[in-house]
A protein has these predicted regions:
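Conserved beta-strand scaffold positions in the cores of enzyme catalytic domains, especially
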Residues: 10, 61, 122, 151-153
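Long, well-ordered, tryptophan-enriched scaffold segments
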Residues: 116, 120, 148-175
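A conserved hydrophobic secondary-structure block that centers on an alpha-helix together
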Residues: 65-131
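Soluble non-cytosolic domains of exported or imported proteins
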Residues: 56, 101-109, 153-157
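Noncatalytic luminal/extracellular "stalk/propeptide" segments of secretory-pathway proteins
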Residues: 1-94
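Surface-exposed loop and adjacent secondary-structure segments within mature catalytic domains
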Residues: 124-158
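Short, solvent-exposed loop/turn segments at the edges of secondary structure
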Residues: 57, 78, 117, 146-147
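Stable alpha-helical elements in mature extracytoplasmic
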Residues: 1-2, 7, 106-110, 115, ...
Length: 175
């Protein structure tokens, strides 16, 4: 209608297929701490992510700070674990989308690449320049050559906390 009103001489309405993803139930996750305590993570599923099922996903966490580090660690270290892509946005870039693009690699292709090495799930640091409790989501892309694994974004505050805890302890379990 608007195109015709604007004077376009030829307007077509054509059907097309578009991906459709529906967010499931509210996502929850936590880190199991010594003494039976837990730390609740602020997280949200990445767009296009598969769900974790009724039983969820639970495993130890391996932190990586780049795609190169993931590839260097390989299947012997990654298999059966949850990969935590802790790739912060570079605050020194004047053009914030440059930082966004570099940090976004973990979100865009991290789940597919982690699955290649046998990971059972992925957590990514939210793409935000500030430290806060609000997870930011976006989409991920899977590779049909590897299993689709659940993927979530965690808040930047929780990413900082989790990274610090991983430096202190050799094993942390996330559910």
């Amino acid at each position: 209608r608007m195109l015709k009103e604007a004077g376009a001489d030829t307007v077509y309405l054509q059907p097309c297929m578009v991906p459709h993803w529906v967010r499931g139930d509210k996502e929850t996750g936590y880190v199991k701490l010594p003494g039976g305590k837990k730390y609740d993570l602020k997280l949200t599923a990445l767009g296009n992510s598969v769900g974790s099922g009724a039983k969820g996903v639970q495993s130890s966490v391996i932190e990586v700070r780049s795609m190169a580090e993931l590839h260097d660690l390989g299947e012997n270290v990654i298999k059966g674990k949850i990969v935590f892509f802790n790739i912060p946005m570079n605050p020194t870039y004047i053009r914030s989308f440059r930082a966004y693009g570099q940090a976004g690699i973990g979100r865009r292709s991290g789940p597919a690449q982690a699955a290649k090495y046998g990971a059972i799930g992925v957590m990514v640091r939210s793409l935000a320049s500030n430290i806060d409790e609000y997870p930011h989501t976006g989409t991920t892309q899977y590779n049909d050559s590897f299993p689709k694994i659940p993927a979530v974004a965690i808040s930047t505050k929780d990413a900082e906390w989790l990274s610090g805890e991983l430096r202190k302890k050799t094993q942390l379990s996330v559910f």
